[in-house]
């Protein structure tokens, strides 16, 4: 049987899988369009997306906006499916990136790394300024019920929308994220009430992933003991693969730098041991001696590179196997 669909407003994803937006440069148009072509929601990561632009150091705002528009356009040329953009609230260019994504007609904006309280306001202002009714869906990334409550109150106040879920007959979709690796995991979360799941790690280990092959190889080589939790220079925790770069920072090392990207609001150059943007750009290019790879908790289970098509097909088979598994018989004594 087919996966159940994931419905976000009038968007219908035939495969209830959202590919995680992975920056810097790990998920761009190539990966996103491949996922969308398989019926899922492909997501372009907005963080430092202009890293390859010639003027990124001298004009980071325009370089990033230009690259974002181009990646959305490239994805559109490669698929008729659903394309989203992940934009972190912590970015100094958050509002500009949101506006550009809306104007470029991204289907969905996913936003976390902070509470995206002003997303509806920016959306409405963009519609008014451009005199156009855009259809971009807005999806906050949250980690608690309290955060959901805060966002719901703020968004209702700023949009005037009322909570009419029962009258509309449409449930608000919840997309579960974290540790989703198999079709069985997808079934588990959907049984708990999720409408879909987000997956990141599995999509790194695909031919279509936009990262360098050496970055992907780090995933294949990873063992469970290689996974650690780090606190990034901008104060956010993350799961990463231990390497010499991370070890040197833990030992009190510091890589002096001049801030040229001005990418994250919370970055204080005088207190920051290294430039997170530079480290992640190096990693994306395969230079892991001068950077590191963020990862998911199941990275040690990755053992080969596959196509996006084969990955989603295998997830479908695993999902079907759980559905078709005979119920255990109960034997009375």
Label the model's feature ranges.
Residues 26, 180-181:
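Residue-level detector of alpha-helix initiation sites
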Residues 45, 86, 141, 177, ...:
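Generic beta-sheet signal
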Residues 1-163:
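Active-site entrance/lid segments in N-terminal catalytic domains of soluble metabolic enzymes
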Residues 18, 148, 157-175, 181-333:
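Conserved active-site-proximal phosphate/metal-binding subdomains
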């Amino acid at each position: 049987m087919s996966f159940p669909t994931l419905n976000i407003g009038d968007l219908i994803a035939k495969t209830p899988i959202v590919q995680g937006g992975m920056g810097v440069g790990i998920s761009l148009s190539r990966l996103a369009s491949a996922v969308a072509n398989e019926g899922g929601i492909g997501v372009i990561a907005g963080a430092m997306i202009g890293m390859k632009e010639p003027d990124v150091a001298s004009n980071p705002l325009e370089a990033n906006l230009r690259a974002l528009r181009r990646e959305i356009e490239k994805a559109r040329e490669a698929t008729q499916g659903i394309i989203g953009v992940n934009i972190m609230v912590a970015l100094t260019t958050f509002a500009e990136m949101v506006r550009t994504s809306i104007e470029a007609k991204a289907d969905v904006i996913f936003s976390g790394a902070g509470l995206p309280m002003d997303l509806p306001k920016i959306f409405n202002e963009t519609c008014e300024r451009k005199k156009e009714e855009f259809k971009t869906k807005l999806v906050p990334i949250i980690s608690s019920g309290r955060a959901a409550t805060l966002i719901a109150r703020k968004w209702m106040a700023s949009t005037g929308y009322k909570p009419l879920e029962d009258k509309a007959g449409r449930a608000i979709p919840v997309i579960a994220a974290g540790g989703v690796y198999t079709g069985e995991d997808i079934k588990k979360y959907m049984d708990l009430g999720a409408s879909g799941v987000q997956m990141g790690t599995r999509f790194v280990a695909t031919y279509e992933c936009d990262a360098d092959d050496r970055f992907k190889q780090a995933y294949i080589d990873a063992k469970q003991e290689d996974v650690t939790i780090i606190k990034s220079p901008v104060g956010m925790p993350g799961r990463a693969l231990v390497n010499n770069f991370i070890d040197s920072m833990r030992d009190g090392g510091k890589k002096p730098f001049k801030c040229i990207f001005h990418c994250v609001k919370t970055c204080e150059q005088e207190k920051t041991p290294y430039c997170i943007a530079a480290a992640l750009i190096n990693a994306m290019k395969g230079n892991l001696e001068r950077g590191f790879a963020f990862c998911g908790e199941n990275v040690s289970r990755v053992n080969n590179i596959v196509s996006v098509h084969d990955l989603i097909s295998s997830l479908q088979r695993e999902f079907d196997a759980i559905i078709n598994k005979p119920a255990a018989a109960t034997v009375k004594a």
